[in-house]
Amino acid sequence: MKKEVTKQVYAYVVCVICLGVGIIFLCVGIYGVIKIISPEFTIHKWEWKKVATFQSFKTDWEKTEGAVQLTDEELRIRWQDKKEIAIMGEKRDGMQNLTNMLICFVIILPIFIIHWRLARKLREE
């Protein structure tokens, strides 16, 4: 009798742990979706300040020691490239978060199901 109770407690503890990890990775996945949909919203503040406006990019460029003197048009092209790269990087991070969530669920779901069935079987006995 005591052995079955111990096994049942073990099974429920594993289920609770799986649920906790699943909830954490669900949050990571939701944040990943937000990063994909609106990368400007989730990008780091210090990185966004560099590329948010052309003027801020130009000011940073001019402050850089040893920076090549470029025309406004050349600077604008570099600014657009840098902004696009920052946004693409944020979207890529979002895709990685989503992938991590899916991998976690692929691993956790069978563990949860096995232990949930074990706990139910032990409870019925």
Stretches with model-predicted labels:
Residues 93-107:
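N-terminal membrane-entry
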Residues 16-19, 54, 72, 109:
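Intrinsically disordered, low-complexity regions enriched in Ser/Pro/Gly/Gln/His and often acidic
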Residues 1-15, 103-125:
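Juxtamembrane interface at the cytosolic side of transmembrane helices
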Residues 1-4, 8, 12, 85, ...:
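Membrane-helix interfacial "entry" motifs
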Residues 32-95:
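Low-complexity, proline/glycine-enriched hydrophobic segments characteristic of transmembrane helices
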Residues 18-28, 32, 104, 108-111:
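Helical transmembrane-bundle signal
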Residues 28-43, 115-125:
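Perimembrane helix-loop junctions in membrane proteins
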